[in-house]
Amino acid sequence: MKLLDLTLPSPAENLAGDEALLATAEAGAGGEVLRFWESPKPFVVVGYANKVASEVNVATCAARGIPILRRCSGGGTVVQGPGCLNYALILRIQADRPTGSISMANQFIMERNRAALAHAASALLHPPSEFRVQGHTDLTLDGLKFSGNAQRRHRQFLLFHGTLLLDFDLSLVSELLLMPTLQPTYRDRRNHDHFLTQLPVSRDQAKTALVHAWQADAPLSDLPPLRIRELVAEKYSRAEWNFKF
């Protein structure tokens, strides 16, 4: 698997970067990749089918100049920004392997990530804490969420990407997001302030844990610039896409 640690200048380009990796692999010009990125400024990302007005405090975002974008994968709405580390996995779909179906891929990827991050944090937590996969694709620490994840599939490859809250300003979530319309049972109607936590590891520790877990030891120098420009122009810079629901 190849490794790319690259943050692009804008939110639109970073979302397009994940999708471009998937498109490149599907076209036969790429393969399995682990990418990291972290936005230097806050923005809101809604899941593909989310309704912006139902999930986002649109007026507050507008007043503060915080962009609202839509990603190509499912899942819920999140706030991005400094202290929120993003990863993206491009994996080959094989019918007889754990990537063969949506549910199998969710279980396989989430458990591998859980084990890797729990191991990285174990030496720092006294007393020991419980790391679990909860909901469909959440990672929790003692029942508090620190990672949300989503999947997008093509015929030959899938994109599985997510966030890791490390030293993020969690107050932004309550300011910018409404209570989600769909909630996992384990949330138990808790508000954002009582539902989220940070993973107590450094960026380098989190990255190293996932790099080792996925054996991403072959460097990838760059993202496909032409495809990114096309995706930004066609989708991620357009209100027709970002506010389609």
Predicted regions and their residues:
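Glycine- and Gly-Pro-enriched alpha-helical subdomains that act as flexible
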Residues: 138-141
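N-terminal lobe of the biotin/lipoate ligase/transferase fold
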Residues: 1-100
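Long, positively charged amphipathic alpha-helical accessory segments at protein N-termini or as interdomain linkers
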Residues: 104-131, 147-245
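Short Gly/Ser/Thr- and Asp/Glu-enriched loop/turn motifs at secondary-structure junctions
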Residues: 39-41, 132-136
